[in-house]
Amino acid sequence: VGSEMCIRDSHSGDSACILPSKHIPVRHVQTIKEYTKKIAREMNVRGLMNMQYAIADDKVYVLEANPRASRTVPLVSKVCNINMVKLATDIVTRELTGRPSPVKDLKDRKIPHIGVKQAVFPFNMFPEVDPILGPEMRSTGEVLGLANSYGAAIFKAEEATQTKLPTSGRVLISVSDRDKNCLLYTSDAA
């Protein structure tokens, strides 16, 4: 719990993700944990489950609940230093193996570093393709930046995408009125 995305009208797979969240209030994290437990029990999930939430007007909304793993599992496992696939396998196979469930041993713990998942897009290789994002996923992969600060983790993730970023020049930032609150940084040319 605690990754953070700000997306509108774009596929979640095309978004960046920061773990642990820098801005989600503790009360919302607690609500997300409660909802996830209730939904997992109701769906009788054994193993991994993919949940997507949104927070709007100080309220937590469930967007999706999928009783399956997502392609983000390896990245979250790496950031949290937890082998989630092994845990899920142990949970699913415990009746066959006779081993006790590892669930009771799971505890909340501090995430040892900051992780940023960034989508990789093919636009450098296909300049004729329109780079505008929409509801259909356009990314072709993901990378992970790990560091002890948010800025360094973001930098490492961007660097890993191998997208050529200019070091000088001007930037046009165009944001609709309804998305302006999602703009994290403003630019001021010096």
PLM-predicted stretches and their roles:
Residues 3-4, 8-183:
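ATP-dependent carboxylate activation and anion-phosphoryl transfer catalytic cores
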Residues 188-190:
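A short, hydrophobic C-terminal helix/tail in secreted or cell-surface proteins
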